[in-house]
Regions:
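Short alpha-helical segment of the dimerization/phosphotransfer core of two-component systems
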Residues: 54-59
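Helix-loop junction within the histidine kinase core
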Residues: 70-81
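Short helix N-cap motif at coil->helix boundaries in the Bergerat
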Residues: 86, 169-177
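Primarily the dimerization/phosphotransfer
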Residues: 1-38
Length: 229
């Protein structure tokens, strides 16, 4: 079974790498269209271009998740920690999700204490990826014209980074299962690979931290990442 798992991991990694190149080329071509380098587009062409870009971005995101998963499974997760301000991670996540939030009229609110927050010694790319993924989920699971909250607070020797939505919430029966690979809450209509939360948990735990959820049906969900300051 170990040989089979190893072959599967290698196959997924190879395919993911092969997919990234043509997807990136598609996105570059679409950028040329958006910049009107080949002439102005009519309304129908603009809508088609946006649709293609959204799907290409989603596909690129999935390949990224697969590559992250194979690194974890192969024990090849490389950490490059550096001193990082929590607010920088929050700002990165917001920037990455602002277009999607605007599309659905979702207001992103920031909660950040006025007192000086301690810095983190983390792999900023990986923790930013986690926060971006959590905020993306919050936006996608929110009602149109709703709001989501992203923030940070100090808890003794820890810093908590959190994302909260006010959507339908998660049944308590699935509070642990949502962190399993490929798990999808039964009945959910939001598209996804079922890998994001699993990889996020792996990244956080690789830093010696925890990723937990607080959720109640009909009241939304709050994902909390706790890291040593």
């Amino acid at each position: 079974f170990k040989e089979l798992d190893s072959a599967k991991t290698t196959f997924i990694s190879t395919i993911s790498h092969e997919l990234k190149t043509p997807i990136s080329a598609i996105l570059m071509s679409l950028q040329l269209l958006e910049d009107k380098r080949v002439g102005a587009l009519n309304d129908e062409q603009e809508q088609l271009s946006k649709s293609i870009k959204e799907n290409a971005d989603r596909l690129l995101g999935i390949t990224g998740e697969l590559l992250n998963m194979t690194q974890v499974e192969a024990g090849k997760l490389q950490m490059m920690p550096k001193i990082t301000k929590p607010i920088e991670l929050i700002e990165y996540a917001i920037k990455a999700n602002q277009v999607q939030a605007d599309k659905f009229g979702i207001q992103i609110e920031v909660e950040y204490p006025e007192e000086k927050m301690p810095k983190l010694f983390v792999d900023s790319e990986k923790i930013a990826w986690v926060l971006t993924n959590l905020l993306s989920n919050a936006v996608r699971y929110s009602k149109e014209n709703g709001r989501v909250v992203i923030g940070a607070k100090r808890e003794k020797e820890f810093v908590e980074l959190y994302v909260q939505d006010f959507g339908k919430g998660i049944d308590p029966r699935y509070h642990q299962s949502i962190f399993d690979r490929y798990f999808r809450v039964p009945g959910t209509k939001v598209q996804g690979s079922g890998l994001g939360l699993s990889i996020s948990k792996d990244f956080v735990e690789a830093h010696g931290g925890t990723l937990t959820v607080e959720s109640e049906l009909g009241k939304g969900s709050k994902f909390i990442m706790r890291l040593k300051a």
